[in-house]
């Protein structure tokens, strides 16, 4: 049939028709694969950029953590030094009162360590001449003078000439020892033993 058409056309004196150009249409699969490949390429580049930024952030955080770790180490060393200083101070504080306590205990036994007022005889105590004499001589003289007689009471404190007559007020206690000189205390203890 085509040969017949060609013969008719040539008989009429017409030119030979040019061959028809067929346009090539890409297949659907090729289009989809191209778009997929292009999208995946862009996605991979985007992910690569994000990972690179994440790595940079991790490096920065690691540097900051290293700096903080060194700072924490310095603080730990300071804390350990302060703890050792506190322990040594506690040891000094626990041992110092014991040494000072011996002196305090030893000082309590004598009236010399306590602050005293000037040794003046109390009113009512007839021992104005005791301070200028030897305590042992005074005790011997008092014992000779105040020997009890059969007709007199045995208590020396009831006699008006006794030095302790002014110290007793009925059944009341003696004068506080801190207000009296040591010689007077020895005098009173000797008379009480008699």
Curated annotation (Swiss-Prot):
Q: Which UniProt keywords apply?
A: Coiled coil
Region of interest called Disordered, as start-end residue ranges on this chain: 101-176
Q: Where is the composition biased (Acidic residues)?
A: 135-145
Q: Where are the transmembrane segments?
A: none
Q: Which InterPro entries match?
A: DUF4677
Q: Which stretches are annotated as coiled coil?
A: 39-68
Tell me which GO cellular component terms the UniProt record holds: cytoplasm
Top-rank taxon of the source lineage equals Eukaryota
The family database entries (PANTHER family) matched by this protein are listed as:
COILED-COIL DOMAIN-CONTAINING PROTEIN 184 (PTHR31554:SF2)
What name does UniProt use for this protein?
Coiled-coil domain-containing protein 184
Give the species this sequence originates from: Homo sapiens
